[in-house]
């Protein structure tokens, strides 16, 4: 094996750990307490042992502190058992302990013998325990060194030819952040106090600031904390109010124990989102925690030490799916006491905001029992807030700001009339602003400046998309803490230390965070039903409670009228099996109706087991499909499968053109109309050959380096048939098999879980139980689904494809002889040179196939030929010309040449703002770059760029259109930058970002055309580097020129770049670029919103 095979993966390890060495190099640096060096390798060792030692990599951040002994104090199995029991007892994250769980042993027996295995060995522990090579390593290095290796280091083992897998240590994927790139890009220009580095190729570079190290950040935090404590002690000695000071300091430490976010002073100057260093190992994301209740402190992550304010978020998911009235509003809640529930008072609200949160209302013990003096002084103003809340007429404000349009009685019974009756986010903001003005006393704002700044954040928050979020740092930006006298311990003017300002800032951030996350979000949930909609990306619609009630009632009645569900009587509900999981029904608005979504929600053991069994069923069906692809018929899962089909057709069609007939058919209500009997038959037929087969289920993580997107990670779950060999169960054999199948190369893999106790008959039994026992609750009634499958299940698409694949194998078996059939779940597309075959296929589907529940929707049927009798045979369908761009699943196919382009008409009337989820990151520039690069990789698909499938003219047009859309996304991202960051503050960085995207697009285009000469430095080939760069220049100039004030510092650089490229390209190639950039071909983009 050459060293070059491992260079990429070793670079990954070196970027994650301070020290990365082979086991041989690690052993050479060990000096025992007895005075001699470790001798791991000896001349008499076998070649396999030497290769093993040189193929094990030891990674750590610190050196071995204690001087080890070379003695053997216990056997290797005893040492392994001691390490595993210690890890589980101390609850430490370590790959070695994955799969090792304590059996049903009493606690006394566990503590009695730590040198005995108290759980089943699996995964890494089983691999090490059964390895004679590791026993030899332990014998030569001693117990102390082996314990240090397995308990404190991260050890990786080579899996030839180019991967490694982790066997112990904290999982490596914890050190890879997906929110920020690994580069040091910042939004501000470089400072003279910092060193700079070069990025890009040759002279195309930009000097940007390096991020600080993690150690420096932690050291500065400790220093600030020590200084704060010293100054606090000084003030305590000097203060006359010694008792009140002591209380305040007690609250300070109590709040630290409650993991409240501490806001840095730099946040107030607007630098928090710009100058934070990109840590190698970021704090855990708050999204890992379950969503809190309404009004709860969702910005508290529970992490310790507390996260900085730039990493504490309030999410728009908090106000989705509410609309339950004001009785659940946080200020209308009552506190449970020994004497019974009572209304909130000022003191209760202070505790709700600054201390316990919502658990306080449920009777949780008060901490501290007496409010400190500073907080005690706040009670009157918060009491006035409650009084103003009880006097506020929310309903009249709601009717005035968000009125309901009066409809006729006939229109009130139609979904098409009620669906558009949603309130614009701006109207919702006006309602919230009016309520905030009426309820919050002026004293709490401190100044009109603070009030207007908070209103601005509320307006942006309500206009956000479904997965957007705002950080506490962004919420506190430009807020003047000194304007708020209620934060002070004493109302007298005078000097105070920086720690006092930091403390006041933290208190104010807590209040404003509660005001947004508790009051605003709670008020929106109480008065509106906020939901996403089909075809509107992540945009949120706000429906008045009474409008949504009518919509939901109409949609449910129509759903029941289809005969797919039967109501259960109370006796039938009581007789349901104990483990029955009851689903909830939710509706999502569409253009012309409502889509029902069935979801199983809950955290109990039955729900978790149900989800696990569904995932197992899906994985087994996927494994079965991999071994027998014919089960899926003509199913395509995305653009990659479509490209494979068209690549087999297009070359022959281009060489010898012939008339092609296209038929597009969409099935109406595909999921809801599948007959249970037929579905049981299909799944039984699919799983019957493997009912006695044993399946292995492996969960693993993968880390790899992308030259343009930095370090990336992904999590996967794979199910395979077990052949009983060691290669199918060991992680090393699994990684080697992945490399043989070209699924993984130059990557670090971490096994998370492994199981081999699944059988096909178990999956078939669960599927039958799931199908017959699908129970749905809506309101106070319970129903059983007697037809169709739930739309919200992860396995629904696969079940639908298997059923339709079975139908195709029965009815359309002969199509492959003359035509090509593709189906994306329930969207059929037939391409055939035989007109009779096209008419026969269309006739069968239009007539319906009741045994499979297939009923075609005539409004979505499209053909490019007339019927047999001048169009009279198919009167209700859409007929296109023989030569046209044929629409199917967001694509446009040329019916003559089979060129493919994307259908951008679906963007008409939509805002690109809602197609992107940027979030509020402390390194927004890095997040923007990573997001745009990942989108570019997805959009530059071979389906549009492959010159064997598409003509050169079509490929150029596809490139220009996707780059033009990328420029629109770039503008949307710039508009969304937090802390008023602009391109003018660092135009070099944004120019470099555009340049990097052009380089990445060039690489993706060449990757899509492997084997073809597209262009080089001698201006040869069909698609030159300079041509793609010029397309980027033209697209970005076209979009950014419409916003000259924003990009006044960037546009001259793009014009200079454009002129240079035009000089490099010849007349012929320049004409090709201008042909693709013709404004007449960009009509689809005119209706797009940004």
Curated annotation (Swiss-Prot):
Span(s) of short sequence motif TFLY? 316-321
Q: Which SMART domains match?
A: Telomerase_RBD (SM00975)
Cite the binding residues for Mg(2+).
666, 826-827
Effect recorded for residue 503 to A: Impaired RNA template binding
Q: Which GO terms describe its cellular component?
A: chromosome, telomeric region; telomerase catalytic core complex
CDD domains cross-referenced by the UniProt entry: TERT
InterPro entries, per database record: DNA/RNA_pol_sf, RT_dom, Telomerase_RBD, Telomerase_RT, TERT_C
Source species, domain of life: Eukaryota
Locate the compositionally biased regions of type Basic and acidic residues: 218-232, 252-262
Q: Which UniProt keywords apply?
A: Chromosome, Magnesium, Metal-binding, Nucleotidyltransferase, Nucleus, Ribonucleoprotein, RNA-binding, RNA-directed DNA polymerase, Telomere, Transferase
This molecule's function is given as: Telomerase is a ribonucleoprotein enzyme essential for the replication of chromosome termini in most eukaryotes. It elongates telomeres. It is a reverse transcriptase that adds simple sequence repeats to chromosome ends by copying a template sequence within the RNA component of the enzyme.
User: What's this protein's family per the entry?
Assistant: Belongs to the reverse transcriptase family. Telomerase subfamily.
This one is known as Telomerase reverse transcriptase
Q: Which organism is it from?
A: Oryzias latipes
């Amino acid at each position: 094996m050459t060293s070059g095979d491992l260079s990429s993966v070793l670079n990954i390890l070196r970027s994650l750990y301070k020290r990365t060495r082979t086991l041989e190099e690690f052993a050479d640096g060990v000096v025992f307490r007895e005075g001699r060096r470790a001798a791991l390798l000896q001349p008499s060792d076998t070649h396999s042992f030497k290769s093993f030692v040189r193929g094990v990599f030891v990674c750590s951040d610190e050196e071995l502190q204690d001087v080890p002994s070379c003695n053997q104090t216990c056997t290797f199995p005893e040492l392994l058992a001691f390490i595993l029991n210690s890890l589980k007892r101390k609850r430490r994250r370590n790959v070695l302990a994955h799969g090792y769980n304590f059996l049903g042993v009493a606690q006394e027996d566990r503590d009695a013998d730590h040198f005995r295995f108290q759980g089943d060995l699996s995964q890494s522990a089983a691999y090490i325990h059964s390895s004679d090579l590791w026993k030899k390593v332990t014998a030569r290095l001693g117990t102390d060194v082996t314990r240090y290796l397995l308990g404190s280091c991260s050890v990786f083992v080579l899996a030839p030819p180019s991967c490694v897998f982790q066997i112990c240590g904290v999982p490596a994927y914890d050190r890879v952040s997906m929110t920020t790139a690994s580069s040091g890009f910042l939004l501000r220009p470089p400072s003279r106090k910092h060193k700079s580095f070069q990025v890009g190729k040759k002279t195309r570079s930009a000097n940007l600031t390096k991020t600080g190290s993690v150690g420096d950040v932690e050291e500065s935090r400790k220093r600030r904390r020590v200084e704060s404590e010293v100054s606090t002690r000084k003030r305590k000695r000097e203060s006359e109010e010694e008792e009140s000071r002591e209380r305040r300091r007690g609250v300070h430490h109590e709040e630290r124990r409650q993991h409240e976010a501490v806001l840095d002073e730099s946040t107030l100057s607007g630098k928090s989102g710009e100058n934070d260093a990109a840590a190698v190992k970021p704090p855990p994301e708050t999204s890992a925690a379950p969503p809190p209740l309404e009004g709860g402190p969702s910005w508290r992550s529970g992490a310790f030490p507390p996260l900085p304010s730039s990493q504490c978020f309030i999410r728009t998911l908090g106000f989705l799916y509410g609309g339950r009235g004001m009785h659940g509003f946080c200020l209308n809640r009552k506190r449970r006491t020994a004497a019974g529930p009572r209304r909130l008072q000022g003191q209760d609200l202070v505790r709700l905001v600054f201390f316990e949160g919502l658990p306080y209302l449920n009777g949780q013990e008060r901490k501290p029992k007496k409010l400190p003096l500073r907080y005690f002084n706040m009670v009157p103003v918060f009491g006035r807030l409650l009084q103003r809340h009880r006097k506020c007429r929310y309903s009249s404000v709601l009717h005035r700001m968000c009125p309901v349009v009066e409809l006729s009685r006939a229109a009130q019974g139609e979904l098409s009339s009620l669906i558009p009756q949603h309130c614009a986010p701006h109207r919702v903001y006006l309602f919230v602003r009016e309520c905030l003005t009426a309820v919050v006393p002026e004293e709490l704002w401190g100044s009109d400046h603070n009030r207007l700044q908070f209103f601005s954040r509320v307006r942006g928050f309500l206009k956000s998309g479904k997965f957007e979020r705002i950080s506490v740092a962004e919420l506190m930006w430009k807020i003047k803490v000194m304007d708020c006298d209620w934060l002070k311990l004493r109302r007298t003017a005078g000097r105070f230390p920086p720690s006092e300002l930091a403390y006041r800032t933290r208190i104010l951030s807590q209040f404003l965070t509660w005001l947004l996350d508790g009051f605003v979000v709670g008020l929106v949930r109480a008065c509106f039903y906020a939901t996403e909609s089909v075809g509107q990306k992540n945009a949120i619609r706000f429906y008045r409670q009474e409008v949504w009630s009518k919509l939901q009632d109409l949609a449910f009645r129509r759903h029941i009228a289809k005969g797919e569900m039967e109501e259960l009587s109370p006796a039938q509900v009581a007789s349901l099996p104990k483990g029955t999981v009851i689903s909830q029904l939710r509706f999502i608005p569409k253009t012309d109706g409502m889509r029902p979504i069935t979801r199983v929600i809950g955290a109990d053991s039955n729900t978790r087991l149900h989800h696990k069994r569904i995932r197992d069923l899906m994985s087994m069906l996927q494994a079965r499909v991999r071994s027998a692809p014919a089960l899926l018929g003509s199913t395509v899962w995305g653009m990659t499968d479509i490209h494979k089909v068209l690549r087999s057709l297009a070359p022959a069609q281009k060489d010898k053109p012939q008339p092609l007939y296209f038929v597009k058919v969409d099935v109406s209500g595909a999921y809801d109309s599948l007959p249970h009997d037929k579905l049981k038959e299909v799944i039984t037929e699919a799983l019957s050959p493997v009912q006695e087969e044993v399946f292995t289920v492996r969960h693993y993580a993968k880390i790899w380096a992308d030259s343009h997107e930095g370090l990336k990670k992904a999590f996967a779950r794979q199910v395979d048939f077990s052949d009983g060999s060691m290669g199918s169960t060991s992680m090393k054999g699994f990684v080697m098999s992945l490399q043989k199948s070209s699924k993984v190369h130059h990557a670090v893999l971490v096994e998370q879980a492994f199981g081999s106790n699944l059988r096909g008959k178990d999956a078939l039994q669960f599927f039958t139980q799931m199908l017959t026992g699908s129970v749905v609750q809506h309101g106070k009634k319970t129903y059983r689904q007697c037809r169709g499958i739930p739309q919200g299940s992860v396995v629904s698409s696969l079940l639908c494809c298997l059923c339709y694949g079975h139908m195709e194998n029965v009815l359309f078996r002969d199509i492959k002889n003359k035509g090509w059939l593709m189906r994306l779940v329930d969207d059929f597309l037939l391409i055939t040179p035989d007109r009779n075959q096209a008419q026969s296929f269309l006739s069968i589907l239009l007539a319906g196939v009741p045994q499979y529940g297939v009923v075609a929707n005539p409004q979505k049927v499209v053909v490019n030929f007339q019927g047999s009798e001048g169009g009279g045979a198919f009167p209700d369908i859409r007929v296109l010309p023989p030569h046209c761009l044929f629409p199917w699943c967001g694509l446009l196919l040329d019916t003559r040449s089979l060129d493919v382009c994307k259908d951008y008409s679906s963007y008409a009337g939509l805002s690109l703002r809602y197609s992107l989820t940027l979030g509020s990151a402390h390194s927004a520039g890095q997040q923007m770059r990573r997001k745009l690069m990942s989108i570019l990789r997805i959009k530059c698909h071979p389906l549009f760029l492959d010159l064997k499938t598409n003509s050169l003219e079509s490929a150029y047009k596809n490139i220009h259109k996707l780059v033009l859309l990328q420029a629109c996304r770039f503008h949307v991202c710039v508009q969304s930058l937090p802390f008023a960051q602009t391109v003018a503050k660092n135009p070099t960085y944004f120019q470099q970002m555009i340049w990097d995207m052009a380089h990445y697009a060039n690489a993706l285009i060449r990757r899509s055309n492997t084997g073809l000469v597209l262009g080089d430095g001698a201006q040869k080939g069909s698609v030159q580097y300079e041509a793609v760069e010029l397309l980027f220049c033209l697209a970005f100039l076209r979009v950014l020129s419409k916003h000259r004030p924003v990009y006044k510092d960037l546009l001259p650089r793009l014009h200079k770049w454009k002129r240079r490229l035009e000089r490099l390209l010849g007349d012929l190639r320049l004409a090709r670029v201008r042909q693709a950039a013709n404004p007449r071909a960009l009509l689809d983009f005119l209706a797009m919103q940004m």
